[in-house]
Amino acid sequence: MKNAAMLSIGAYVPPYELSNFDLEKMVETSDEWIVKRTGIHTRHIAKNETAGDMAAKAADLAISRSGISKEEIDAIICATITPDFFCMPSTACITAEKLGLNKGITAFDISAACSGFIYLLEIGSALIKSGAKKNVLIIGTEKLSSIVDWKDRATCVLFGDGAGAAVLSCMDNKNNGISKPYGIIDIHTASDGNKAELLMTPTKNSNIKDIADENLGFLHMKGNEVFKIAVQTLSNDVVKILKKNNVKPEEIDLFVPHQANFRIIEAVKNRLNFTDNQCVVTVGKYGNTSSASIPIALNEAYENGRLKNGSLILLDAFGGGFTWGSALIRFGL
């Protein structure tokens, strides 16, 4: 049976940094308050760039590292909740054009909020395993600054902009002697719409009561409730995927969770007995970048020499919907 591999990773964040001290001048908050509750020190903000612009820059880097030419990419999928256009064209179509990919390439977007990259992995690897595609470019890209209410101190301190991309490819003739399990070993995704209103961006079409018109189009979150559900759900999901694949926590080279909040990351890490050396944490530098957070973290681990060919990595994410998921991957090959 064919398998899929993650050949490469790439990321891009816009150059402008907005620090906690900058936010002190904008809303009633403080660096101490933000760091204590979130672990975030700064975030990057896209001033004159769209999600598609950032996606193309992250994808260019991932493709350059993959050993695959642009002509060999036969599908591009973007995960985003902040697309360049309201409903069409898709950000994937826009990004394919920016990259100069083949005309007629399969291109579409998905929306799974902070779990978007896990969903991309599942869809992309399924296309490859089925034989429908050979090389799939997946991109999580977000301009969350465009949906943040900059007067709401509870949410505006949390989010940043950026993009992360990966090239997935058929494992044919790419095993290079690495013993199984290899490639994309297992992925689990799930959802529960019962608590959708705890984390949402309502519009006039949403029919949500008690939200004034001037607050439509902004991200709304009940943070304490989301925190409790996220920690429990993520912990359970990781336990299941490890048990299913007979992998012990100490066998994981890198645990790369969605970078939402340092307290959530620490809570899940401690519940599962991962060490600091295993855990990749970038939330302090970039804030919550939703679907881009996991590939941005993977890219940083790669550039720092922590993510290597053959590394066994565990990813997990939880986001609006609710959506969540986990993935077990042997990187590279």
Curated annotation (Swiss-Prot):
It catalyses: malonyl-[ACP] + acetyl-CoA + H(+) = 3-oxobutanoyl-[ACP] + CO2 + CoA. GO terms for molecular function: 3-oxoacyl-[acyl-carrier-protein] synthase activity; beta-ketoacyl-acyl-carrier-protein synthase III activity. It is an enzyme of class 2 (transferase). The keyword Lipid biosynthesis applies. Its EC number is 2.3.1.180. GO terms for cellular component: cytoplasm. Pathway: Lipid metabolism; fatty acid biosynthesis. It comes from the Bacteria. Keywords: Acyltransferase, Cytoplasm, Fatty acid biosynthesis, Fatty acid metabolism, Lipid biosynthesis, Lipid metabolism, Multifunctional enzyme, Transferase. It is found in: Cytoplasm. Catalyzes the condensation reaction of fatty acid synthesis by the addition to an acyl acceptor of two carbons from malonyl-ACP. Catalyzes the first condensation reaction which initiates fatty acid synthesis and may therefore play a role in governing the total rate of fatty acid production. Possesses both acetoacetyl-ACP synthase and acetyl transacylase activities. Its substrate specificity determines the biosynthesis of branched-chain and/or straight-chain of fatty acids. The last Arg residue of the ACP-binding site is essential for the weak association between ACP/AcpP and FabH. Homodimer. PANTHER family: 3-OXOACYL-[ACYL-CARRIER-PROTEIN] SYNTHASE, BETA-KETOACYL-[ACYL-CARRIER-PROTEIN] SYNTHASE III, CHLOROPLASTIC. This is Beta-ketoacyl-[acyl-carrier-protein] synthase III. The gene is fabH.
